Regions:
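Hydrophobic membrane-targeting segments
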Residues: 1-50, 190-228
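Membrane-proximal N-terminal soluble sensing/regulatory segments of transmembrane proteins
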Residues: 44-119, 143-149
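A structural signal for well-ordered alpha-helices, especially hydrophobic packing surfaces
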Residues: 39, 63, 67-70, 94, ...
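Polar/charged, Q/E/K-enriched amphipathic alpha-helical segments with strong coiled-coil propensity
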Residues: 80, 109-162
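Extracytoplasmic
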Residues: 147-185
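Individual transmembrane alpha-helices with interfacial aromatic-anchor signatures
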Residues: 51-55, 149-158, 187-196
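A structural signal for long alpha-helical coiled-coils and helix-turn connectors
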Residues: 43-46, 74, 105-108, 135-139, ...
Length: 228
């Protein structure tokens, strides 16, 4: 009887140890997955949101520089730059903008972002045509006509591009907020796994103590039986 009871107790302990091992492995796997998801979220927040937001700022900065150069050339009566020199500077800014756009396109883009980016590329192309048209008419139009040409087309083109850049900036904010919420959910999930692990350890510990206590009771009864 004592041998049978001992086998039964060892079986229970073995099952409990197996449960401990299984639960520990499961929780560990879930925690590893959470950590990977968190790393992915933070990486996306930096590479796909923070860096593009910075690039959008640089594009806006270069766009403003282009507008300032062309506007100064059109409205100033004493230009320090020739039409060719201005054209070279505008092309240099265009090249920088194209480089930033190519870099931006390699990041992860949401659908709304893709639409705004396509719209931006079209407007930038239209803007290049307008700038070229103004420069081509420098020697054929007087200052008043040249200013009218700028006011009627180029100025609005710059404003449209700025508005599109603003929309892209808003996308970074919205998607960045979503990534932040996702990261917070992952953190809460990780805390839950840790709490479950602690509760399981407490429950299994209590069961082991109860088994050992029951074993001591049986041993005392057997000792009394032997004394009798």
């Amino acid at each position: 009887m004592k041998f049978a009871y001992s086998i039964k107790q060892k079986t229970k302990i073995a099952i409990l140890l197996f449960l401990i091992m299984a639960c520990t492995i499961l929780i560990r796997l879930l925690e590893d997955r959470s950590i990977k998801n968190m790393e992915k979220a933070f990486s996306s927040l930096y590479n796909d949101r923070l860096v593009p937001a910075t690039d959008i700022f640089y594009i806006s900065e270069k766009l403003y520089a282009k507008r300032f150069l062309l506007e100064t050339f059109v409205y100033s009566d004493q230009n320090k730059l020739s039409a060719q020199q201005l054209n070279d500077k505008l092309k240099a800014y265009d090249k920088n903008i194209d480089t930033l756009l190519a870099k931006y396109e390699k990041t992860f883009l949401v659908n709304n972002e893709k639409n705004h980016l396509t719209e931006l590329k079209v407007k930038l192309l239209e803007n290049k045509v307008l700038e070229k048209n103004i420069l081509l008419n420098v020697n054929t139009l007087d200052k008043a006509a040249l200013r009218k040409l700028y006011d009627s087309n180029a100025e609005q083109s710059y404003l449209d591009i700025s508005n599109t850049l603003s929309q892209l900036t808003k996308v970074q904010t919205v998607v960045g907020e979503q990534l932040k919420e996702e990261s917070q959910k992952i953190v809460r999930g990780t805390n839950l796994y840790s709490t479950l692990q602690l509760l399981i350890a407490i429950v299994i510990g209590a069961l082991i103590v109860s088994i050992l206590a029951a074993s001591n009771v049986v041993n005392i009864r057997n000792d009394k039986f032997n004394l009798n």
